[in-house]
Design a protein with these regions (language model features):
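S-adenosylmethionine/decaboxylated-SAM
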Residues: 1-148
Length: 148
């Protein structure tokens, strides 16, 4: 996962870097901290296998901003695109590269829109001059049906 930047604050304006440091100082680690998802590719594959999903599963290791630069890593089209990387730069890159691959009437789910200001800023900037309707899922999640 990418490191947060200054723009990446909570909805209350708290610095993400300070918040994560507080959690680490309290002994919260990567295994039980829901704010930081850290697991091996093997764990990811095991989780997909629980749901009998084995086909068309390609796991790509590395920072999203780098892995999305490699054309071979990209699918031809996307039906459901779920973004959950928290920060401005990663969300911005995901939208720039992946949203154009989202099929018409495909679904975009943004996990962190309501919580992290950086993710919200990236989404708002990307869709500034595009006519889309955003639906509120819950406090933090948002959904857009691709009509473009």
């Amino acid at each position: 996962m990418s490191n947060p930047e200054e723009v990446d604050k909570t909805f209350k304006g708290e610095s993400s870097t300070k918040l994560l440091k507080k959690l680490y100082d309290k002994g919260v680690n990567r295994k039980n901290n829901i704010l930081i998802a850290d697991c091996s590719i093997e764990e990811v594959k095991k989780n997909f296998q629980k749901f009998s999903i084995k086909e068309n599963l390609i796991c790509i290791k590395g920072p999203v901003e780098e892995t999305l630069e490699i054309k071979e890593n990209l699918p031809n089209k996307i039906s459901i695109l779920r973004l959950d990387t928290d920060w401005y730069s990663s969300t911005k890159k995901e939208l720039e590269v992946l949203f154009p691959l989202l099929e018409k009437n495909g679904i975009l789910i943004i996990d962190d829109y309501g919580y992290w200001k950086g993710a919200r800023k990236a989404v708002d900037e990307y869709f500034l001059n595009k006519k889309v309707t955003m639906f509120k899922i819950d406090f933090t999640g948002r959904m857009i049906i691709n009509s473009l």
